[in-house]
Swiss-Prot record:
PANTHER family registered for this protein in UniProt: WD40 REPEAT FAMILY (PTHR22850)
Subunit and partners: Binds directly to helix 1 of the histone fold of histone H4, a region that is not accessible when H4 is in chromatin. Also interacts with histone H2B and HAT1.
Stated name of the protein: Histone-binding protein RBBP7
Each WD repeat, start to end: 47-121, 127-172, 180-216, 227-268, 274-311, 317-368, 375-402
Entries under InterPro entries matching the protein: G-protein_beta_WD-40_rep, Histone-bd_RBBP4-like_N, WD40/YVTN_repeat-like_dom_sf, WD40_repeat_CS, WD40_repeat_dom_sf, WD40_rpt, WD_repeat_RBAP46/RBAP48/MSI1
Protein localization: Nucleus
Main location: nucleus
Function: Core histone-binding subunit that may target chromatin remodeling factors, histone acetyltransferases and histone deacetylases to their histone substrates in a manner that is regulated by nucleosomal DNA. Component of several complexes which regulate chromatin metabolism.
């Protein structure tokens, strides 16, 4: 039995390796930017910070990322890293590095990704998210039940060698660990967290700690009957949020309700565990959920009884789903199949040739195939449209942007230019 499993693993490794070679060979045609960086330890979490700096006279901009570590028994850290991304006009396909499968003029740009701040953390960082109203404040999910809050301006850039973790706040309320974490973009300091203990906790950190650094949950929502995988505030309504769980349900909650045990809406969303959700930043009624049933579902809050659409192409569980911050119809999803799919809602139902249909449905805009292990998290860059950072379980972090001709299908207006000066 064991030898059969070993054989299967070897075959899978060979397939992954072959697929990666093909991907690497094709990157100049598929991307305007690819940076591959091996982290010292894998990160389970990634999020771009909102700041960008464009140094005068330089051919790049500086961006920042929040990462974490997942070590094998060594000290863990919350990490803020600085990234140099070349300006659009610097993307030069002739700079392609076939060995690394990288290009974008990066051979010449040294020190493109550097760790700026490392803060001691209790166990691995399951997830880290910054507070929109003050991006220096970062909340983290730990292997314990506590949620930690750090103001990274109050910590030295190099961690204390003792390994002591010294968060600015410790949020109590859960009995077990989890992953889901969401700051309210309309109410400063309001944080939601999802947990394996079947609950969602809400804290208001602006109220400050009662004693020491401990803040107790303001409310605990108990509607789910299994592990709650993810939670997200609505982006426009300050009192609405959604949660998804292993009970296969999507629940919509209103914090103004006088009950915390019953959601406003509960939907059987998928045929397996629901792992993630994301509200559309442009359309107040639209949200998406991702599931172990390998699909992403599209929902309208005005009629949750009816699933608007099911996106099908992933070969395994989906763990992340995020709408683009720049395009109302663009959505991306990733997970266990090592692929990050970018979808375009505006293409749903378009006619396809039989050949194109073999590659996936018309709404599947792009498949990022650069990872050779499960993707743990990804983040859309808020300042550079179409730039995504994705991290996988094998320590690899990739910062990439698909080729413009893939998402910009308008034909270049050559005819008009040719006609200029020809009279009418």
């Amino acid at each position: 039995m064991a030898s059969k499993e070993v054989l299967e693993d070897t075959v899978e490794e060979r397939v992954i390796s072959e697929e990666y070679k093909i991907w690497k060979k094709n990157t100049p045609f598929l991307y305007d930017l690819v940076m591959t960086h091996a982290l010292e330890w894998p990160s389970l979490t990634v999020q771009w910070l909102p700041d960008v700096s464009r140094p005068e006279g330089k051919d790049y901009a500086l961006h920042w990322l929040v990462l974490g570590t997942h070590t094998s028994d060594e000290q863990n850290h919350l990490v803020v890293a600085r990234v140099q991304i070349p300006n659009d006009d610097q993307f030069d396909t002739s700079q392609y590095d076939s060995e690394k499968g990288e290009f974008g003029g990066f051979g010449s740009v040294t020190g493109k990704i550097e760790t700026e701040i490392k803060i001691n953390h209790e166990g691995e960082v399951n997830r880290a998210r910054y507070m929109p109203q003050n991006p220096y404040i970062i909340a983290t999910k730990t292997p314990s039940a506590d949620v930690l809050v750090f103001d990274y301006t109050k910590h030295p850039s190099k961690p204390d060698p003792s390994g002591e973790c010294n968060p600015d706040l410790r949020l109590r309320g859960h009995q077990k660990e989890g992953y889901g974490l969401s700051w309210n973009s309309n109410l400063k300091g309001h944080l939601l967290s999802a947990s394996d203990d079947h609950t969602v906790c809400l804290w208001d950190i602006s109220a400050g700690p009662k004693e020491g650094k401990i803040v107790d949950a303001k409310a605990i929502f108990t509607g789910h009957s299994a592990v709650v995988e993810d939670v997200a505030w609505h982006l426009l309504h300050e009192s609405l949020f959604g949660s998804v769980a292993d009970d296969q349900k999507l629940m919509i909650w209103d914090t103004r309700s006088n009950t915390t045990s019953k959601p406003s809406h509960s939907v059987d969303a998928h045929t397996a565990e629901v792992n993630c959700l994301s509200f559309n930043p442009y359309s107040e009624f639209i949200l998406a959920t991702g599931s172990a049933d390998k699909t992403v579902a599209l929902w309208d809050l005005r009629n949750l009884k009816l699933k608007l659409h099911s996106f099908e192409s992933h070969k395994d569980e989906i763990f992340q789903v995020h709408w683009s911050p720049h395009n109302e119809t663009i959505l991306a999803s990733s997970g266990t199949d090592r692929r990050l799919n970018v979808w375009d809602l505006s293409k749903i139902g378009e006619e396809q040739s039989a050949e194109d249909a073999e590659d996936g449905p018309p709404e599947l805009l792009f498949i990022h195939g650069g990872h050779t292990a499960k993707i743990s998290d990804f983040s859309w860059n808020p300042n550079e449209p179409w730039v995504i950072c994705s991290v996988s379980e094998d320590n690899i972090m990739q910062i990439w942007q698909m080729a413009e001709n893939i998402y910009n299908d308008e034909e270049p207006d050559i005819a008009a230019a040719e006609l200029e000066g020809q009279g009418t």
